[in-house]
Amino acid sequence: MTIRVGVNGFGRIGRNFYRALATQKAEGKNTDIEIVAVNDLTDNATLAHLLKFDSILGRLPQDVSLEGDDTIVIGDTKIKALEVKEGPAALPWGDLGVDVVVESTGIFTNAAKAKGHLDAGAKKVIISAPATDEDITIVLGVNDDKYDGSQNIISNASCTTNCLGPLAKVLNDEFGIVKGLMTTIHAYTQDQNLQDGPHKDLRRARAAALNIVPTSTGAAKAIGLVLPELKGKLDGYALRVPIPTGSVTDLTAELAKSASVEDINAAMKAAAEGPLKGILKYYDAPIVSSDIVTDPHSSLYDAGLTKVIDNQAKVVSWYDNEWGYSNRLADLVALVGKSL
């Protein structure tokens, strides 16, 4: 069965999702997923140009053009390009036979708003961000076993939660987490200013390419949604840094059981080669952020940075906050599509 997908919001994540899915399909994975339509407020000529040319991912190898004013042609693939401004309920998902909507505008993250996609004829909605009042938040490899097909509005959490989740799961399963604090050293995003200017967050008001910008992250608290046993036990913040992609999570946790550096690294390696294969990757090489750009894993564990004092452990994991997350988005569409 083909899983027909509509994408609402063809920005950084929407376009990365398209490219990640195309890469997976070329490798023989998730070949039953078809993107049939995208919707964005931006004109379609601009969308086609930004899909073809990408400052991080480079040029798309296929030719990209417009057919008429409502179809983007990518190689021999045609995608309906909508410009519906009235909100999810006004989208023609029913007429287009869309099964799953990827909601990636960053606007309709509340379930009441996202429900408009269901009213418009879609069967499932996946929000590519932390959400409110959603039926379930899923981090693949951590709690995807909780999806039973009855949930219609699903959050794929954040890129940082997708990195932190596997780390926290392994630590908690093997040694127990009493409490912990995390920092994500995160690439800048569109929610920051290129130059100093007004912003509701006065730190993010400052020039993104010139500063290390401390700001909030909900990733640590969101862990409680996917690992309920850790609810209220983790907290942290983000440091936005002047790079376009490639981020890293630093977690310091008090463990219930004492463990050595070797114990922790062995547990992470076993998980990366076993139940979390494809989600968690184990590195013992001395890598830097550019080394993990376009790596499809959610979390790339850096064994050389593990530290332990008594029962306090520090673990570090890298992630491509765009590409890794977009690959999980494609995998979540596949999981949800199987229940249709």
UniProtKB/Swiss-Prot annotation:
**Which Enzyme Commission numbers does its entry carry?**
1.2.1.12
So, what pathway does this thing act in?
Carbohydrate degradation; glycolysis; pyruvate from D-glyceraldehyde 3-phosphate: step 1/5
Q: Name one Pfam family in it.
A: Gp_dh_N
Q: Which UniProt keywords apply?
A: Cytoplasm, Glycolysis, Isopeptide bond, NAD, Nucleotide-binding, Oxidoreductase, Ubl conjugation
* Gene Ontology molecular-function annotations: glyceraldehyde-3-phosphate dehydrogenase (NAD+) (phosphorylating) activity; NAD binding; NADP binding
* Broad EC category: oxidoreductase
> Site (Activates thiol group during catalysis): which residue positions?
H186
* Positions of NAD(+) binding: R12, I13, D40, K85, S128, N321
Q: What does this protein do?
A: Catalyzes the oxidative phosphorylation of glyceraldehyde 3-phosphate (G3P) to 1,3-bisphosphoglycerate (BPG) using the cofactor NAD. The first reaction step involves the formation of a hemiacetal intermediate between G3P and a cysteine residue, and this hemiacetal intermediate is then oxidized to a thioester, with concomitant reduction of NAD to NADH. The reduced NADH is then exchanged with the second NAD, and the thioester is attacked by a nucleophilic inorganic phosphate to produce BPG.
- Subunit structure, as described in the record: Homotetramer.
- Output this protein's name: Glyceraldehyde-3-phosphate dehydrogenase
